[in-house]
Amino acid sequence: MNEDFMKEKPILPLLTTMALPMVISMLVNSLYNIIDSLFVAKISEDAMTALSLVYPVQNFINAVAIGFGVGINALISFHLGAKEGEKANIAATHGFFFSILHGVILTIGSIALIPTFLSRFTTDSNVLKSGVEYANIVFVFSIIIMMNLTFEKVFQSVGRMNVSMIGLMLGCIANIILDPLLIFGIGFFPKMGMRGAALATGIGQLLTLIFYLFAYFLRPISVRISRKYLILDKHLDLKLYGIGIPAILNLALPSLLISFLNGLLAAYDQCYVVVVGIYYKLQTFLYLPANGIIQGMRPLVGFNYGAGEIKRVKKIYHLTLCMNGVIMLLGMIICFTASPYLIGMFTDNATTISVGSNALRIICCGFLISTISITASGALEGLSKGGQSLIISLLRYILFIIPLAFVLCKAFGPQCVFHAFWITEILTAAIAALLMKSSLRLPDTQA
């Protein structure tokens, strides 16, 4: 397959072609996140609390898979742009091997540690039981998640975005269908409650992997994963982790933030923990589609950067910025005007709806300005500048928001914690813009 279309095709139709499949798949994934939570919420509010508490660990596992996949994607795209097909194959093969290793370690570690982790945030026996039941099943599929993300990023690196889209949608749709069947025991399916929700998730992930394997072997691509490429290459492996670790941290930092917020707010009322969990489900409807556009941008930036087309890289970045800005503006308007309805989808508790509605209106004030941070972070990853991307995420998820949340909570009460979000977005966006401007002005030709 000839990937030169990435530096020859007009930018708007090119980015649209690359991004649209990922936006669609991310929207379906967002729908799954919402529907999955809605079904769990129908079990009980304790079940919803358990899901909210397990979410940071799930998010960390996904962060390792996606973040390391970003490293694989960036290196493959760069070497294809530089006409170094052999190195692209080595990057894909080494990435696949390390991803499986990550999956084994995370499966064992997460199952062993989840009871202790949950007990730090709640003493409610029902919440603990539901959380452990869910986690013990869903974490078994960590290896499959790692393999899925490797194939997804390999397909994306050669412009086969439709394959990624179909694979993601297949898993999400299967999950949506299986959720009510396995949770509530409809028809001949057993009533499994939280275990059913976890099993539905795992089956969906397995179906995605099966599809990727069929696509890889039936319609070969220019990048190959093979044992013959499993050769010692310390420089390449260091580059994989040099890009992958910052990307992993970028994605894992929200887990630390959520855990911090849960610990801070649980001392006041359980409804605040539920609100944080609901918000992070709702915001996927904005940030996942925006991430879909960024996924379409990233291989284009990497390929053109490797080919020395710096002006084209700038145009791709600025167009992505505008497209994500439209998504965030729409999201801000919807969340501000319909917050009671959105929170009410997950709970009928009047206190939770009131607290959640107020929180959502406050947080959404930072959506539009966050466009700069998320787009710059994704572009820097595509440019193999993982360290600078990590700086943006550290500011956004740790260095600004955690001190702000703590001070606001202690000074004005838990309801004021949510102001830390929009203040953080403004501060981070200013620094992200400067980092991106510097990177585009001073391109690094080494990889």
Q: What are these model-predicted stretches?
A:
Residues 1-19, 76-143, 189-245, 301-366, ...:
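Short alpha-helical transmembrane segments in multi-pass integral membrane proteins
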Residues 8, 12-31, 35, 57-64, ...:
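Residue-level signal for short hydrophobic patches within transmembrane helices
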Residues 17-36, 137, 171, 204-208, ...:
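Transmembrane helical elements of multi-pass membrane transporters/channels
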Residues 27, 31-49, 118-125, 181-192, ...:
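Helix-terminus/linker motif at the lipid-water interface of multi-pass membrane proteins
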Residues 48-108, 145-164, 262, 275-339, ...:
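Small-residue-rich hydrophobic transmembrane alpha-helices
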Residues 60-63, 107, 175-180, 209-213, ...:
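Hydrophobic transmembrane alpha-helices of multi-pass small-molecule transporters
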Residues 69, 73, 138-156, 164-172, ...:
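Short runs within selected transmembrane alpha-helices of multi-pass transporters and secretion channels
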Residues 110, 153, 179, 183, ...:
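Structural signal for membrane-spanning alpha-helices in multi-pass inner-membrane proteins
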